[in-house]
Curated annotation (Swiss-Prot):
It is found in: Chromosome; Nucleus. Residues 226-322 form the RRM domain. PANTHER family: RNA-BINDING PROTEIN INVOLVED IN HETEROCHROMATIN ASSEMBLY-RELATED, ZINC FINGER PROTEIN. Keywords: Chromosome, Metal-binding, Nucleus, Phosphoprotein, Repeat, RNA-binding, Zinc, Zinc-finger. May play a role in chromatin organization. Disulfide bonds: none annotated. Residues 622-649 have a biased composition (Polar residues). The lineage of its organism: Eukaryota, Fungi, Dikarya, Ascomycota, Saccharomycotina. The gene is NRP1. It comes from the Eukaryota. This is Putative RNA-binding protein involved in heterochromatin assembly. Residues 392-415 have a biased composition (Low complexity).
Length: 719
C-alpha cells in the first residue's frame, strides 16, 4: 500500500472565465504506507511542466502514469493532497474533456485523501485539540485587522503545522520553487498525521475513508440513478438560476434540493456568508445540493458539465456584484438523498430574503415590512402572533364544524405551531411569523367545480395557497376589536351544504348547523347565543339568529353602527382603505379593490367589471336596512328571514323581513351570469333550486325540505 502525494499548479489568465484555467505543473511523491519512507529525496522531487506547446496535458498524464507504476508496480495506492483536491476532482477531468482525451481510471474517478478533512477527523477524536483550536480562533478574531479573514479562513496552515508539530525548515524566498515547497509540506503533514494516529478511534476513522469517486460512479450506474450532487454553488443561488444554467446546455432537471447550512458560526441570519461542508472546495463561501433528472441517461450526460462555471448576482450584500463559481457535479443515488432528507430544503425562488418581522398579507400574498400595520397593496390589517386564530384541517365536515364552534366559544387563539404540525401540507401559509417567504401564490381554478352563484361565492373566501388547496378565511374581521382572520382547511369544496355551513358560520355564527346530508343540527345552540349577540353588535349592522327562539334584544343597538363600515362585505368591510387611482375598479362580486392593470379580480378571479354605475358595481348594503323598527327597507335592499317570515317573539308588530340583513347579498352572481338561466339541485334542500334571470331577480326556494337555510326564504337581488 502506497500514498501518492499529488500537487497541481494551475494557471489562470486574467479576464477569462474560471472554467478556462489550465494545469501548469504536476509534482508528486510516493510514500510507503507501512514504513512512511519517501521514494524520492528532497533534492530530486519529480515535476512535470505542462506548457501546452512542448508538453501537453495528455503527454504529461502518460508520463505520470508511467512513473507511478515504475515505482509501485501493481501495488495498491491512493492519492493524497493538501492543496489540489479540488483540481484533481474537477479541473483535471474538465481540461481532459476539453482537450479530447481520456484520463486513466484512477484520475478520471479518483480516490483521494484530503488532508484538511483527515485533520478535522483526527481533532474530533482528541477533545483537548478542539479546545486549543477554539482558543486560537478567538485570539485571531480579537485582532481587528484580521478579524474578518480569520472568521472566514477555515484552512489555517500555521494551525495544522503547530498542532501536528511539523518541522518545516526556513528557506530563503526564491531558493525553492513553490510547487516543491507545497509538495514537501504536504508530505511532512501526511507523515506526521499518520504517526499521531495512535488511538483505536484514529485507526478507524483517520486516513481510512477517502473521497471515492470510483465507488460513487459504480453505484450510480448499477442503480441507474437520476440524481447528481452539486457543490461549490454561489451562496444565494436560486432555483431559476439553476434552471437557466442547465437549460443553456440543453437539459431540464425536474427537481433541486440544497443542503441547509448547519454550521453554528454561519447560521446567523445577518451573516450572508455560508460555510461549505466540504473543506476542499475552491470557494468556501458556497453551498451544495442535489439535482434530479427525468432519466438516467440524461443525468449521465450532465456529468460532462463537471467543472463548468456558473454566474450569480449577489444582491443581499452591501456591495452587490456578480460572482463566478466553478460547479462540481458528482454522481449520487436515492440512498444518499434519503439519508440527507432532514438537512435538505428547496432552493429559494427569489434572492429577496425576508428580514425578521416581515409578514405576508393573508389577503393578497404581498410581502410587507415589519413596520407596516396594513398591507401596502390591499390595506388588509397585519396579523400578529397573538391574533392569528387557526383550526386543524379535517375532511369530515362535522369535525370541522365542531372545531369552528369550539374556537368561537372559547374566544382564544390556538397555538400556531400545533396547527402547522397537524396540517397535512405542513401549513406554510400559517407560519407567517417565522419569516418564511412562500413561493409565488397561484390561484388554481382546477380545484373548484363549475362556477355557480354558490361556488363562486365560496371561492371569494378562499385565499390561494402553495399547495393549490384553498384556505377559507373567516369574514368576521373588524378593526374595532383587532381580531385577525381565522384560517381553516376544508377538502369538501364540492359539497354545497358544507360550503353553506362554513360560510354562514364564518359570517354570522348561525347555530342551525348542517351536516353532509343537509339535515339540521341544533347542537351548541345555547352556547353561541351570547357570542352571536356580541358579535352582531360589534361587527354587523343587523342581527340574525337561526335558533328556534329568536333573540331581538340587540336590534336597537345596531343602527348606531351603520356608518362604521362594519358590514364586512368580502374581507375588508366596506372594501379597501386604499384610495382609488385612475383606472382602479371594484369587483362586482366581492367588492375587492383591484388596480387598473388587473384584468381579473385578485381575490375571487372574477372578470373586470365593465359597468360604469357605481351602484351597480359595488354591492353595498343600504343603511336604511338597519336601525329602528319604524324604518322601512328600500326597494334595493335584500331581505332574508331565517324564521320563515314568522313574527314570533316580536313585540312591536313589525315584520321580521324588513329588519334582517340578507345573507344572499354575499352570494350575488356576477353580472355576466345574470343573462342566462340555470338549474341548480334537485329539490332536496342540498342546493339552490332555481335561478331566474328576469330583471336579475333570484328566487331561492326549497321544495320538500326547508333545512338549507333555517326555515327557507325567498329573495330577489337588484343590481
Amino acid at each position: 500500500m502506497h500514498y501518492v502525494v499529488l500537487e497541481l499548479q494551475v494557471a489562470h489568465l486574467p479576464d477569462t472565465p474560471k472554467d478556462q484555467c489550465r494545469i501548469a505543473n504536476i509534482a508528486f511523491q510516493i510514500v510507503n504506507a507501512e514504513t512512511l519512507v519517501c521514494h524520492y529525496g528532497t533534492n530530486s522531487l519529480p515535476s512535470i511542466e505542462v506548457n501546452g506547446t512542448t508538453k501537453s496535458l495528455e503527454s504529461a498524464m502518460v508520463q505520470l502514469d508511467k512513473d507511478i507504476h515504475d515505482v509501485i508496480g501493481n501495488d495498491d495506492f491512493v492519492l493524497v493532497s493538501l492543496y489540489s483536491t479540488w483540481h484533481i476532482r474537477v479541473t483535471l477531468p474538465r481540461q481532459a474533456r476539453d482537450d479530447g482525451f481520456i484520463l486513466t481510471s484512477y484520475l478520471q474517478h479518483p480516490k483521494v485523501f484530503d488532508l484538511w478533512k483527515e485533520f478535522d477527523r483526527w481533532c474530533v477524536n482528541h477533545p483537548e485539540i478542539l479546545g486549543q483550536k477554539k482558543a486560537i480562533s478567538n485570539n485571531n478574531c480579537n485582532t481587528k485587522s484580521i478579524s474578518i479573514n480569520a472568521a472566514k479562513n477555515t484552512k489555517d496552515l500555521d494551525e495544522i503545522v503547530r498542532i501536528l508539530e511539523v518541522s518545516i525548515p526556513t528557506e530563503e524566498a526564491g531558493s525553492v520553487p513553490e510547487i516543491y515547497s507545497l509538495l514537501k509540506r504536504t508530505t511532512d503533514i501526511l507523515i506526521q498525521l499518520h504517526k499521531k494516529c495512535t488511538s483505536p478511534e484514529d485507526m478507524e476513522s483517520v486516513l481510512t475513508k477517502p473521497y471515492d469517486s470510483h465507488t460513487d460512479i459504480r453505484a450510480f450506474l448499477q442503480e441507474k440513478s437520476k440524481i447528481l450532487y452539486m457543490n461549490n454553488l454561489p451562496p444565494d443561488t436560486t432555483q431559476s438560476e439553476l434552471e437557466s444554467w442547465f437549460t443553456q446546455y440543453g437539459v431540464r432537471p425536474v427537481g433541486f434540493w440544497t443542503v441547509k447550512n448547519i454550521v453554528e458560526d454561519t447560521s446567523n441570519v445577518n451573516n450572508n456568508w455560508s460555510l461549505n461542508n466540504s473543506p476542499y472546495v475552491e470557494d468556501q463561501d458556497s453551498i451544495s445540493g442535489f439535482v434530479v433528472f427525468q432519466t438516467h441517461e440524461e443525468a449521465t450526460e450532465v456529468l460532462a458539465l463537471n467543472g463548468r462555471s456558473i454566474l450569480s448576482n449577489l444582491a443581499n450584500t452591501k456591495q452587490p456584484r456578480v460572482v463566478e463559481h466553478v460547479l462540481e457535479l458528482q454522481p449520487s443515488s436515492t440512498g444518499v438523498l434519503d439519508k440527507a432528507q432532514e438537512i435538505l430544503s428547496p432552493f429559494p425562488q427569489s434572492k429577496n430574503k425576508p428580514r425578521p418581522g416581515d409578514w405576508n398579507c393573508p389577503s393578497c400574498g404581498f410581502s410587507n415590512f415589519q413596520r407596516r400595520t396594513a398591507c401596502f397593496r390591499c390595506s388588509f390589517p397585519a396579523p400578529s402572533n397573538s391574533q392569528i386564530h387557526t383550526a386543524n384541517s379535517n375532511n369530515n365536515v362535522n369535525s370541522s364544524r365542531n372545531n369552528l364552534n369550539n374556537r368561537v366559544n372559547s374566544g382564544s387563539s390556538s397555538n400556531i405551531s400545533n396547527t402547522a404540525a397537524n396540517h397535512p401540507y405542513g401549513a406554510p401559509e400559517f407560519n407567517m411569523i417565522a419569516n418564511n417567504t412562500p413561493a409565488a401564490l397561484t390561484y388554481n381554478r382546477a380545484h373548484f367545480p363549475a362556477i355557480t352563484p354558490l361556488s363562486r361565492q365560496n371561492s371569494l373566501n378562499m385565499a390561494p395557497s402553495n399547495s393549490g388547496s384553498p384556505i377559507i378565511i373567516a369574514d368576521h374581521f373588524s378593526g374595532n376589536n383587532n381580531i385577525a382572520p381565522n384560517y381553516r382547511y376544508n377538502n369538501n369544496i364540492n359539497n354545497n351544504n358544507n360550503n353553506i355551513n362554513n360560510m354562514t358560520n364564518n359570517r354570522y355564527n348561525i347555530n342551525n348547523n348542517i351536516n353532509g346530508n343537509g339535515n339540521g343540527n341544533g347542537n351548541n345552540s345555547n352556547n353561541n347565543n351570547n357570542h352571536n349577540n356580541n358579535h352582531n353588535n360589534n361587527h354587523h349592522n343587523g342581527s340574525i339568529n337561526s335558533n328556534s327562539n329568536t333573540n331581538n334584544n340587540n336590534n336597537n343597538n345596531n343602527g348606531n353602527n351603520s356608518n362604521n363600515c362594519n358590514s364586512n362585505i368580502g374581507m375588508g368591510g366596506c372594501g379597501s382603505n386604499m384610495p382609488f387611482r385612475a383606472g382602479d375598479w371594484k369587483c362586482s362580486t366581492c367588492t375587492y379593490h383591484n388596480f387598473a392593470k388587473n384584468v381579473v379580480c385578485l381575490r375571487c378571479g372574477g372578470p373586470k367589471s365593465i359597468s360604469g354605475d357605481a351602484s351597480e358595481t359595488n354591492h353595498y348594503i343600504d343603511s336604511s336596512t338597519f336601525g329602528p323598527a319604524s324604518r322601512t327597507p328600500s326597494n334595493n335592499n335584500i331581505s332574508v328571514n331565517t324564521n320563515g317570515g314568522s313574527n314570533a317573539g316580536r313585540t312591536d308588530g313589525n315584520d321580521n323581513k324588513g329588519r334582517d340583513i340578507s345573507l344572499m347579498e354575499f352570494m350575488s352572481p356576477p353580472l355576466s351570469m345574470a343573462t342566462k338561466s340555470m338549474k341548480e339541485g334537485d329539490g332536496n334542500g342540498s342546493s339552490f333550486n332555481e335561478f331566474k334571470s328576469d330583471k336579475a331577480n333570484v328566487n331561492f326556494s326549497n321544495v320538500g325540505d326547508n333545512s338549507a337555510f333555517g326555515n327557507g326564504f325567498n329573495s330577489s337581488i337588484r343590481w
